[in-house]
Amino acid sequence: MDSDEQIEVSTLEAYADTIVPGEKRFPDDHAIAGASPGPGAVVAGALELLHTEATGVTVGLPYLAESLNHHAKVYAKEHDLTLDASLPSFVALSFEDRTALVRSLTAPGHPEKDGWVSLALFCNMSFDSAAHKHTAEAIAEGHPGLLAMGYTAPDEDGLWRFPKFSYRRELARIHPDTTPSGSPA
């Protein structure tokens, strides 16, 4: 079996991939199940975001990974599944079984629900908003989640402008005292 750090990383990657699935990075990628085409939460930076101290979950990640593998062993036993002993238990589950286990861990009434939901939210945030990066930096790097949602690069001055109004009309004129940076005077 791998080192504790490798077990933690692959387990958390498998959890992130369960939340926002993506394609395998390489043929023998066990953490990413390959359940969806294109990049998912892992490629979008889920582990980078989870290891950002501002999330408040960083200190608990080793415990969460260990707990997730324990839950996976129990799940496998309850469902008469044989797990590959060379992999962390959660990583060894199929995508369908990972999803079923995460669904039970995040269900109303589960005593650990808050922790698993928090972890899921940060995995989503890594894909949906690139919360671990400045938006312009993420766009310049080709962040997969932002690109999938249609974000475009800012103008040369770093500001986003939209030539077409969402309601097909300008809702308000810019206040005459607005500064060049867009701030009110």
What are these regions (language model features)?
Residues S3-D4, E8-L12, A16-K133, E141:
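Flexible, low-complexity segments enriched for small/polar residues
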